[in-house]
Structures are given as C-alpha cells and as structure tokens.
C-alpha cells in the first residue's frame, strides 16, 4: 500500500498541512521541522502526488528544463548531467515535476511550447550573445531562468561570474611570471566567451599589457577540422593549436589560457604531438567544464565550479519566481582557482 501524506504527518508528529508546506517549499516552516519531515518522507518512501496537487491548484507544478542542443552535442561531458542532478535535487524535495526537453525554437515558439506542455516555468541552458529566444522568453507569461548563462536580464540568470573568474586566472598566470599569454577562447558568440575575454583584458590591462589578434585562438561555432582524432571543442582546439605550432613553434608564448577544460585537452594533445612539454615549454590552464582535469598528466590548473550547485540554485530561483513573481538580483555560483602542475613558475626566468 502506498505511503500517504497522513502517514508522514503521523510519523513526524505534525499536521498534514505542515507536511504539505514543508515538502512544497513554503517558508513558514522552521528549518529543523522541514528537515525532520523530509527525512521522514524519504525513510517511508513517500512520493508527493504532483498531479493531484496540480488539479487542486489548477497548476501543473511542472518545470521544463530545456537544453536546445542536447541531441547534437558531440562532447562527452558531465556538466549537463550534474546540472540536471541539481535541478532534480531541488524539485524532488519541493514537490515540483521536471522534464528535460531538447526543444528546437525553430519548430515551435516558446509560447506554443508552454501551452502544449502545460509548464509553469522554464529553465534553459547555453544562451548565446545574440539569442533571439531571449526576447520571446521575456514576452511570454511564464517565468524563466537562464542556467549556466548570463542573459540580458540579470535577475533571471544563474551562473559563474565569468569575467571575474577569467581575470583571476589571468592574474594567476601573471603572478607566475607569464606575460606572453595565448588565449584559446573557443567558439565565438557565447556570452561566456565574451565575459571571459573581458576578464582577461581587464587583468592584463592592469599590468599595461594587451592582446593582439595573434594572441587569440578562436573559431566559429560548428567549425570542424579534417582528420582530427578527437571531437567537438577538443577537435577544433587541437587543429588550431597545430596550425599555431607549425607557424610559431615555442617561445612566442609561454602559457595557453583556455576558456574550457575541453579546449585545454585539445591544446594539450597538439603540444604533445609536436614534441613539446607541459609546463616546461607551455604552461596550460582550463576553465572548469569537467572533473577529469586533475587526473591529467600533468594535472590541469583550472577554474573549478560545481554544475550541481548551478542547477539547484537555478531551480530554486525559478520556483521563487513561480510562487512570488518577484525579481531578485543575479546570483553567482562560487568558483576557485585550482592551481596544479600544468603551470610553471617563471618569475625567476
């Protein structure tokens, strides 16, 4: 026989209304009581009846998690999976239903999408700088939050402070004596790339340094190289770095600052295949898109963050907007510079 909300209330020694409020995110319940009820519900195996609650409130309590290029992604990363875990972690403890969609806005508008799927809110990832979806999302009566993005509406975004993180990584290299830095920026057009470049330029400008065209490796989204043995951003970084090395060799730059761990993986392969060493010939840094950089040889210096925190915080912000319709300030998830073996100290060189 299925466990009911009354069973949870009886076991926890509280009223049915208190259990309902604790499991649906109301703030009139103390933290201690909420934790006790949640632990009791988990122990008994209670599953909230989302459909029943939706009928009573005439709301679906359903969140759409939209990852537009989910079916087209070539890279094998755990960022998306960890963000989904974070979203589900919040929603499962607050009585919300979440469904993942690989929605193509060219096939159906967001207004049509919300109507056909009866969603009360939208979480969307990977918005690019000139994203036409943003204006459409602003016009529909359904709250949304951009995840792992910094869209043009600050109160509707959850992500890392990319400019600050890139500036910190640049300062880390400068502090270690690197003044000839090659920036492997990756695919053009993303908000992340633009903000990270702002951070790099800011930190270098503070040292009266600048970047020239020859100091940047980037490429158009979807650009592919031929005969490269790896895929996605790694493939493109590998190809671009091979071209760079054939033209400049070593000595022109002492460090490569990558806007993605996956870009760093491609850069590393090109450097190794050309017979150069990391960090003796090129120091190398990434930007926290993976959890495997620390297992590289040498271990990759990178910007670390947890996508699970991003997913959880995004779902929480969206839930607040669904319930209270309030605008809040943009929240940034924490990060840190993980200094490892891929950067050589050249201060005395």
What is each of the regions a protein language model found here?
Residues 1-61, 344-349:
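N-terminal helix-turn-helix DNA-binding module of bacterial transcription factors
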Residues 36, 78-93, 191-211, 236, ...:
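Short, solvent-exposed amphipathic alpha-helices that sit
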Residues 62-171, 175, 246, 250:
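Alpha-helical recognition/docking segments in bacterial nutrient-uptake
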Residues 91-102, 201-234:
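Short beta-strand elements in bilobed, periplasmic/extracellular small-molecule ligand-binding domains
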Residues 120-125, 182-184, 229, 233, ...:
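Periplasmic-binding protein-like
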Residues 158-184, 193-205, 233-246, 264, ...:
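Hydrophobic alpha-helical segments within soluble ligand-binding/sensing domains
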Residues 238-349:
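Flexible loop/turn connectors
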């Amino acid at each position: 026989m299925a466990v009911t909300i009354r069973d949870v209330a009886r076991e926890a020694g509280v009223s049915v209304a208190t259990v309902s409020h604790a499991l649906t995110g109301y703030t009139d319940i103390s933290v201690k009581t909420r934790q006790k009820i949640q632990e009791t519900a988990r122990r008994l195996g209670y599953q909230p009846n989302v459909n029943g609650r939706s009928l009573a409130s005439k709301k679906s309590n359903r969140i759409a998690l939209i990852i537009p290029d989910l079916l087209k992604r070539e890279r094998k990363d755990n960022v998306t999976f960890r963000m989904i875990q974070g979203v589900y972690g919040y929603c499962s403890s607050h009585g919300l239903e979440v469904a993942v969609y690989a929605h193509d806005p060219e096939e159906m508008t967001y207004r049509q999408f919300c109507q056909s799927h009866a969603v009360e809110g939208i979480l969307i990832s990977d918005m690019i700088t000139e994203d036409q979806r943003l204006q459409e999302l602003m016009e529909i009566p359904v709250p949304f939050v951009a995840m792992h993005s910094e869209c043009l509406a600050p109160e509707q975004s959850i992500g890392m402070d990319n400019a600050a993180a890139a500036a910190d990584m640049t300062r880390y290299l400068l502090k270690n004596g690197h003044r000839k830095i090659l920036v492997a920026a990756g695919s053009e057009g993303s908000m992340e790339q633009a903000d990270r470049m702002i951070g790099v330029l800011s930190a270098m400008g503070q040292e009266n340094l600048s970047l020239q065209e020859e100091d940047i490796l980037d490429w158009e989204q979807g650009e592919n190289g031929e005969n490269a043995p790896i895929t996605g951003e790694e493939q493109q970084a590998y190809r671009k770095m091979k071209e760079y090395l054939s033209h400049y060799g070593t000595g022109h730059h002492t460090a490569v600052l990558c806007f993605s761990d996956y870009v760093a993986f491609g850069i590393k392969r090109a450097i190794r295949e050309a017979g150069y060493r990391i960090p003796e010939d090129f120091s190398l840094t990434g930007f926290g898109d993976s959890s495997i950089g620390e297992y590289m040889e040498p271990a990759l210096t990178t910007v670390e963050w947890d996508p699970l925190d991003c997913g959880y915080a995004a779902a929480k912000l969206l839930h607040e907007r669904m319930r209270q319709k309030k605008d809040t300030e943009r929240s940034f998830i924490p990060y840190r510079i993980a200094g490892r073996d891929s950067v050589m100290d050249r201060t005395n060189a």
